[in-house]
Amino acid sequence: MLQPKRMKFRKMHKGRNRGLAAGTEVSFGTFGLKAVGRGRLTARQIESARRAMTRHVKRQGKIWIRVFPDKPITAKPLEVRMGKGKGNVEYWVCQIQPGKVLYEMDGVSEELAREAFGLAAAKLPIKTTFVIKTVM
């Protein structure tokens, strides 16, 4: 699963998921899966969607993952009293703003790409849409 190799600090504040997305254009492939809603994706969800797409296209073409989970989420163990410091890192997430391209695909037909992205979208907790690269 995806997670950073090193970080300057192990734990992070919760913060707020506001603002506009960077990476809103399809830049590597021909087709893309773009976020419509706002939320956060865990490393497990990113990997699960990638596997669904890869299996559907039967390993033909190429898939790019445009998001990376770089924010640690902590949790305290069950039945532990409040206080005594922040909990341990449980999993990693990527914060998503509307318009962010999550995945890109190339080397497959549009119909196959739509089906594969549909399977991937079912694994994700945010609303997404299918986009095609615009040639200037």
UniProtKB/Swiss-Prot annotation:
GO molecular function, one term: rRNA binding
Function: Binds 23S rRNA and is also seen to make contacts with the A and possibly P site tRNAs.
GO terms classed as biological process: translation
Biological classification of the source: Bacteria, Pseudomonadati, Pseudomonadota, Gammaproteobacteria, Alteromonadales
UniProt xrefs under Gene3D superfamilies: Ribosomal protein L10e/L16
Highest taxon, organism lineage: Bacteria
Record NCBIfam families: rplP_bact
Identification of the protein by name: Large ribosomal subunit protein uL16
Record text on subunit structure and interactions: Part of the 50S ribosomal subunit.
Keywords in alphabetical order: Ribonucleoprotein, Ribosomal protein, RNA-binding, rRNA-binding, tRNA-binding
Record HAMAP family: Ribosomal_uL16
Pfam families: Ribosomal_L16
GO cellular-component term (any): cytosolic large ribosomal subunit
Similarity remark: Belongs to the universal ribosomal protein uL16 family.
Keyword tRNA-binding set for record: yes
